[in-house]
Amino acid sequence: LYGAPGWRLGLLAMNENNIFGRLIHELPVDEQAAINDRYRLVETDPDKLPFIERIAADSRSIGLYHTSGLSTPQQMMEVLFALTHLVYANGSTDAYIDECRYVVNRRYTDLVKGLGIEADNSRTNAKYYTLIDIYKLAEEKYGKQFRKYFEKSFAQIDFLMKLSEDNGVILMDGVGFGTQPGIIRVSEANLPSKAYGVIAEKINELLEEYCEKYLKTKK
């Protein structure tokens, strides 16, 4: 829903007999039929699907509803993913895998080029996730003195919160992945390709805004 896999923004609890489920069943027959068609892909009897399960299904593409738990289809997909390595082990290639690599690489390139930072094209960089040091980026763009001000005055969580509130871009705090403070994480896995240039643009705009605040303190 937010393009931030693994980030839980809240907890939802609901009585088994709730008003939402009742209101759905009080809808006109044609509207109920349309709703049932929506969930028929993942539920053989969608009319009995609890409202809270509908929310879980709608938190992503409904066809991916099973990813809210380790289901048999998900286990089968894991097996198929593992078997794809046999293709490359035999010296062959796979058009789908090659296309996925191309798409992820293009998104990564758009991101780092937009930020004006050097790309890491080493074999160990899968480019699935990108870790960005916002303090280092601040120094590269506006100098050491600004970095000192920025690092002393704002935590990376302040940057992330403002980025989401003002620019609608939600990224992850890298500390949860074992990084040092100041690192934010971008996933190249799940957003439209055109979004990565926009993410870079919004990060740059926010850094510029912080720099303007810094310059005002110097007057």
Task: Annotate each PLM feature.
Residues 1-219:
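PLP-dependent class I/II
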